[in-house]
Structure formats: C-alpha cells, structure tokens
Amino acid sequence: MAEPSVESSSPGGSATSDDHEFDPSADMLVHDFDDERTLEEEEMMEGERNFNSEIEDLNRESDMPIQELLSLYGYDGTIPLQEDDDDEDEEEEEEEGEDDDDVDNDDNSGCSGENKEETIKDSSGQEDDTQSSNDDPAPSVASQDPQELIRPRRCKYFDTNSEIEEESEEDEDYIPSEDWKKEIMVGSMFQAEIPAGICRYKENEKVYENDDQLLWNPDVLPEDKVIEFLNEASRRTGDEKGLDAIPEGSHIKDNEQALYELVKCNFDTEESLRRLRFNVKAAREELSVWTEEECRNFEQGLKVYGKDFHVIQANKVRTRSVGECVAFYYMWKKSERYDFFAQQTRFGKKKYNLHPGVTDYMDRLLDESESAASSRAPSPPPTASNSSTSQSEREDSTTSSSNQNGLSANGPGDIPSKDEAKPEGLHINGPTGGKKTPHTDLDTNGYETESLSLDPKVAHSTSRSENDFEEKNERPLKRRRINSNGKESPGSSEFFQEANSHGKLEELETLDD
C-alpha cells in the first residue's frame, strides 16, 4: 500500500499553501471537552488541605541543619564546589600562558589544536549534560552547589540600568527643572554686578532736590482722638450749600484735608478745627452752582460727543474743568433733568433709551421694538366689514338725497344691515306716491310681489337675486388678513377675486334687464 502523502496527513489542511484556515480533525476534537466536575473536585481537594500540618513542617525544617535539609530535598553534598573548579581553571590558564611564552609558533599551533579538541570535548560534555537534564530534571537541580543555592546572587538589573543611564546621559538634551524643584534666587550669589559709571547718582546723593512733605502720621495721636477730631470736622453748621448740604451717614470718612491741617498745626486739634471753620472751602471742595446755559451746553455736548468729557469741556463748557464736568455728570444723572433728557433722546441715541428707574430692561426693549414696528408698518386697507359699512353709508346718503328731491333709489323698503350683501335689482326712478304698501307685501327691493310676478323678466331677475342672496348668507365673508410686517396674507387675494366676480355678475344682470 502506498503511504499517504504529507499534505493529506496534515489535519490542518495542505502544508504547502498558507491561505487555508486551520481545520481540526475529528481525533483532535475527541478529548476537547470541558468537564466542570474536575474543577469542582479540585476545589474540594484544595478545601481539604490541612494548613496546620504545613506550619508544623516549616517550623521543623527551620531548626534542621542545612546538610539534612539538602538531603531531605534530594541534594547531595558529594558534588565538588564551583569555586574549586574556577580556581583550577585559572591555574591551568596561567600555566598555558607561561608555556606560550617559551614555545615557538609551531608549538602554539599544536597547543591551539589541542585547545580546540578540549573545547569540542567540553561542548560535547555540555550537550550530554543538557540532554540528561532534559530527561531527568531532578538531578540537574541536585548538581548545583548548596552554597550557591543559599548564597544570594548579585542581580545585574542595576548594572544594566547604570550602563543605560551612562549612555543616555551622553545623548540627552538639556531639560529644565520642574517648577516645584526650582530654587528662589535670593542672595549675594544671584545679584547682578553693575559696572561702575552706569549709575548717574552717587551713593549719598539725592535723586531730586525737593524735600518730601508729610501729609499724615498715624503714630502721634491715638485712634480715638483722631475719630473724635474727624467727627468735629464733619459737624454741620446749617450754612452749607451745594454738595455740603447733602446729609451724610453715621460712618466716618477720611477727610484728607482735615488730617493735613492737623499735621500742619503740629497735631493740635483745637487750632486745626479753628482753621477748618475759618477756611471752609479749603476743607471742603464746594462745587459751585452751574448756570442754565452751562447745563444746556453740557447736555448738548453729551448728545454730540457722548461721554468724552475732554471734548465736551473744550468745545461746549469752557468755563468748567474736566473734573467739574465729571462730578456734574454724576449729579446730573440722579436729577430730573436726566429723565427729561432720556425721554427726548430716546429715539436719537440708544444709549439713553433706558430709564434709570427701570429694572426689567427686556420688557421695555420688547415694547419699544413693537411700537417701532407698528409705526413703520403701512396702514391696513379696509376689510370686508369696513367696505360694507362704507357702501351702506354711501347708499344711506343717496337715499336721503333722493328722498329730499322726491326720488327713491331702492324704494320705500327698510335699509338692510351692513353685514348683508345687497343684490341690486331693478332701479325705478320716479315720484313717490302718497300711498304706501305694507312692509309685509314688499320684496327685498321694496316692490310689490304681485306686480313683479306678472313680468317674466322681473320674476327671473328676482329669483336669481334671491338665490345669490341665500348663497351669500350661507358662505361667510372672508376678511383680509395682514401679517405683523404689514404684508398682505395670501388668503386676502381670494376674497378680492370673489368680490370682483360677484360685482361683474351684478353688472351683467343689470345689463340684461
């Protein structure tokens, strides 16, 4: 029988092609099942393990000598130590080195051949050892020296790291230190060395000639006396005007002018108070009253230039300083003149559009936008009710004029309401007689039904007018709709088309009659 080829014997498909997926055979899937009972049995076995016996064994082994402990775990002490082997190797190398110095090149070549043979033997011996260790792992462990097992070996991890660090230090770029590691550069070692000749002033020379002027020293008088002095300085006499007449609160303000007077009087409170009462303007910067012309010019400049007080002072209010203009502005904003000014300039400038007393600015903004939109929107055209009202007013005027002249347009019938559409029938003009027909015997146009029924044309026209009148009553009148922007809605055009069509029909009826 021919043996099966390698390709057919491979369970995962052909060995030559790598495109096929791995397909396990039936023999491989026979034992491929997961039995949960084995896991449960292993858990039971682990649960039955006695930990007390393990602790006792460990305690017993701790007191045991090292030789007995090694023999207990299968290690023999008859194996020569590795250090002795190392010493022997070193001695052989030294002897070989001495022989190399005395022997010629030929001998060296021979020695090299012998060394090659020895290395081959050693390599073959190592291969035999590795094979035996693979076959029987326990003797390989036993072949190691017990002192080598016990002695902690030096880890080369730190050595490799040190080598890597040495290499990286040579190639690394400069990296600035982190913020928390930075040192505060304070001290003589961090000071700059200024060369001589740059500074214009000498060490004991003053920078400027003028002497300093002391304005206030808080260390001379205690705080209680200073507060009492400020209370006396701010007391009212009743003759104040302008800003000084405004009542102040109970809190104490730092009056710098009063404190400076106290320093000039060598901290004599009575003398400083006397000077303050004698020269009130020096202690209190009184704002002089503005004239009506100055106020009007200031408001006009505020309209034109805004809150640019330098330009306002230069062009409009030259009699006042810029500081006085600023102080007057804040007083003026709290007065009634500002309210009137805001109302007058509401549509001119948006910045004065809001009243100072208004807090809900959004409602005010919406109201103003709606009022502005309604003022810009065109007036709406007359609606259906307005057109009918105007038509009824015109007919009332014509009937009154015809009655005054002795003529009647629509007869002696009652005037229809403004919501009703008036179909126009026959118009018979002539003098009205004194005899009047009762209202119940008259038709919608004010004529007798008996006389009209005799004429076929009149009867036909009246029947058509009654049908049109019923249709108009059944169909509600469409009113014209206008959007908020003042544009006509699309539904309004339909109403005018319908009204025009009705008007044309009525004109045709009158022509036929």
From Swiss-Prot:
Residues 157-261 are annotated as: Interaction with HDAC1. The keyword Lipid metabolism does not apply. Residues 182-280 form the ELM2 domain. GO terms for biological process: chromatin remodeling; negative regulation of transcription by RNA polymerase II; regulation of DNA-templated transcription. Residues 1-16 have a biased composition (Low complexity). Residues 131-146, 483-500 have a biased composition (Polar residues). One of its GO terms (cellular component) is nucleoplasm. Residues 1-174, 368-513 are annotated as: Disordered. One of its GO terms (molecular function) is histone deacetylase binding. Residues 17-36, 46-63, 416-425, 463-476 have a biased composition (Basic and acidic residues). Transcriptional repressor regulating the expression of a number of genes. Probably functions through recruitment of histone deacetylases involved in chromatin silencing. This is Mesoderm induction early response protein 1.
